[in-house]
A protein has these predicted regions:
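N-terminal Rossmann-like dinucleotide-binding module
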Residues: 1-49
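C-terminal helix-rich "cap/oligomerization" subdomain common to oxidoreductases
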Residues: 1-4, 9, 29, 69-71, ...
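Active-site loop of classical SDR/Rossmann-like NAD(P)-dependent oxidoreductases
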Residues: 37, 281-294
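Short, conserved SAM-binding/catalytic segment
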Residues: 44-51, 108-113
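Conserved SAM-binding strand-loop segment of SAM-dependent methyltransferases
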Residues: 51-58
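Beta-strand-loop-alpha-helix segment that lines the small-molecule cofactor/substrate pocket
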Residues: 69, 75-76, 80-127
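Predominantly a Rossmann-like dinucleotide-binding segment in NAD(P)-dependent oxidoreductases
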Residues: 126-200, 205-209
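Contiguous beta-strand/loop segments that form the cofactor/metal-binding neighborhood of enzyme cores
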Residues: 184-260, 294-304, 337
Length: 337
């Protein structure tokens, strides 16, 4: 096992509790420092979650050479700006999804990787969990036959109006917060099958508080020759993070592909033979965030720079821009050129 990382949090955020605080308790990595706009908030956060101390502002955190990894869990619109600043300081970064606000901004960040001593990974934690790996194995094995269709949902009840996920200037919207998971998951499956993912059409329901922000998006795509239905909503009646892959001989389904630790079932249904058969596999309750942190730690310690993962992140960002254009919604504004 590689040596534990000393991790600094850029932002005392809710998502950091899952991605770093709880995950590091499983992995043994060190919760070293927190920086927030309000030092008192950082101090309270550090005390509550067992961090060694705080830094007086974001700049001081990214300048700290004792840190091995900076985690950026700020609002979407700040991801690219602070990833660039951390890379320019020679830090390695785990940045929450989405990597940037739009494709131009993504490329501005990626260009910094060529000269930085550090690297940047986008926090699509679901892709590290064995449940997702097992779904891909079932599809590739031919057990459900030829690929016939995919249905993926990323739906949740509406957050309060004050939530930054509703802010256009902070790159909010259903696709940025939720739909990016669906697009990234489709690309991951497409890579495993050697098939491209193509957007066919998209339509959006705007948020009532700001018509520039998408509350719900419905999109049709194609993975190879198979049709894909995608639904992403921050105004749903409940939670639905399901991924269903249908073939000529059956289907396989993850009820919660984004957080399999909350529902680790992989359901495989066969329609061949006499009657339908169903098998439920249990993929374990370990956190996808812990799997992600172990992978990033190994990459940091081995100085591994994955062009493949960066490429998938870029294709995800390109699809996000394309969905907005196709649905008639404005592209999220960026802070970089």
């Amino acid at each position: 096992m590689s040596d534990p990382l000393r991790i600094g949090l850029l932002g005392a955020s809710r998502i950091a509790e899952l991605a770093i605080t709880e995950a590091s308790r499983e992995t043994g990595d060190v919760r070293a420092a927190v920086a927030a706009r309000d030092p008192e908030r950082a101090r309270a956060y550090a005390a509550e979650h067992g961090y060694e101390g705080i830094r007086d502002g974001y700049e001081e955190l990214i300048a700290d050479d004792t840190l091995d990894l900076i985690y950026i869990g700020l609002p979407n619109g700040l991801h690219a700006e602070w990833t660039v600043r951390a890379l320019d300081a020679g830090r390695s970064v785990l940045v929450e999804k989405p990597f940037a606000s739009n494709l131009l901004e993504f490329d501005a960040v990626a260009s910094r990787l060529e000269s930085s001593r550090g690297w940047a990974w986008e926090a699509f934690h679901y892709a590290d969990h064995p449940a997702v790996h097992r779904l891909i194995e079932v599809v590739r094995s031919g057990e459900i036959g030829e690929l016939r269709g995919i249905d993926v949902h990323m739906d949740m009840p509406a957050p309060p109006a004050s939530d930054p996920r509703w802010s256009f200037d902070l790159a909010g919207g259903a696709m940025m917060d939720l739909g990016c998971y669906a697009l990234n998951g489709l690309l991951l499956l497409g890579e495993a099958l050697g098939e491209p993912v193509e957007l066919i059409s998209a339509e959006a329901d705007p948020y009532e508080g700001d018509g520039r922000v998408d509350a719900t998006v419905r999109a049709r795509l194609r993975l190879g020759e198979a049709p894909v239905a995608m639904h992403a909503s921050m105004a749903g009646p409940g939670w639905d993070f399901g991924l269903r892959v249908t073939g000529s001989l059956g289907e396989t389904y993850l009820p919660n592909f984004v957080k399999p630790q909350e529902d680790g079932r992989l359901i495989v249904r066969s329609t061949s033979g006499v009657g339908a058969e169903e098998r439920v596999e249990r993929t374990g309750g370990a956190s996808s965030y812990a799997y992600q942190l172990r992978r990033v730690r190994d990459a940091v310690r081995a100085d591994q720079r994955s062009a493949a993962l960066l490429g998938r992140s870029r294709r995800t960002m390109a699809l996000l821009d394309a969905v907005y254009a196709e649905s008639g919604m404005p592209r999220r504004p960026g802070r970089l050129g």
